[in-house]
Amino acid sequence: MSAAPLVRDVDRLDPAGVAAVLALLRAATAADGVRPLSEEAELRLQHGGPAGGRDVLATAADGALTGYARFEGGEGTGDAEAELVVAPGSRRRGVGRALLTRLEELAGDRPLRVWAHGDLPGSAELAQRHGYERARVLLQMRRELAGVDPEPRLRLPEGVQVRTFRSGTDEQAWLRTNARAFASHPEQGSWTAEDLRLREAEPWFDPAGFFLAWDGDRLLGSHWTKVHPPGDEGPEAVGEVYVLGIDPDAQGLGLGRALTDVGLAHLRRLGLRQVLLYVEEDNTAAVTLYERSGFTRHAVDVSWRRAR
């Protein structure tokens, strides 16, 4: 019988601790075929996050890292959120249970939501055993790029022009439009200048794949694409419809379709064979639209919630 894991949490990991967690994430990705943490959680692991966040570590008696969780305390009385991963060689040894127990202690009297990426059987079993219920479901959808026109003829409203993002110039306009486009979205609509800055500093950031639709000096919408390197979302590089948003006042002008075409054409010209996107399962209108555009369901992320 293995000894119970040792669990501790810190405000911020040192570089050696971050490196150890990143190695664990790579091992879990290779074993499960899905990244165990969201991009946001990985950024906060590496760069820190808002007040109330904690890095939670589980280790064996010999000090080996067996599990990790990222806890976000949130603000006010809202739900606390977390994501966790257990090392492939340490599963079904109480590590997930120990991490979850500490996350619940950190949440205190507030409800806790825990994201499970890939909706793997082990994560569902752990959540249900501890009284959690499915609260949100995020679909990953994919399509082939072979049928995409690499040089599409765009139908844009009169006076509207599409150009690529200019770092150091377009940030504030994009943040304002993004907040309006995603006013009802719990994560995307709350992006700050720091959130954008961190992504501009990432190795994958490429302004040549970040398209903005302007009417004079007014930003109407954007399509930000991303390229995942081999091993990130599969054995080959994969494109992503990273952020596609239209200002509510510009809805109905056909900009969503035009910007989608521009972004997919860009990814096709890069030689990529597949593109992915994420959409809420209960957003049936968007899911239907994407299915009509050739996307099919590929993977599922689940937010499990337990009321206190």
Curated annotation (Swiss-Prot):
InterPro entries: Acyl_CoA_acyltransferase (IPR016181), Bact_Acetyltransf (IPR050832), GNAT_dom (IPR000182), Mycothiol_AcTrfase (IPR017813). The keyword Amino-acid biosynthesis does not apply. GO terms for molecular function: mycothiol synthase activity. Keywords: Acyltransferase, Repeat, Transferase. One of its GO terms (biological process) is mycothiol biosynthetic process. Its EC number is 2.3.1.189. It catalyses: 1D-myo-inositol 2-(L-cysteinylamino)-2-deoxy-alpha-D-glucopyranoside + acetyl-CoA = mycothiol + CoA + H(+). The keyword Ubl conjugation does not apply. Monomer. This is Mycothiol acetyltransferase. It comes from Geodermatophilus obscurus (strain ATCC 25078 / DSM 43160 / JCM 3152 / CCUG 61914 / KCC A-0152 / KCTC 9177 / NBRC 13315 / NRRL B-3577 / G-20). The lineage of its organism: Bacteria, Bacillati, Actinomycetota, Actinomycetes, Geodermatophilales.
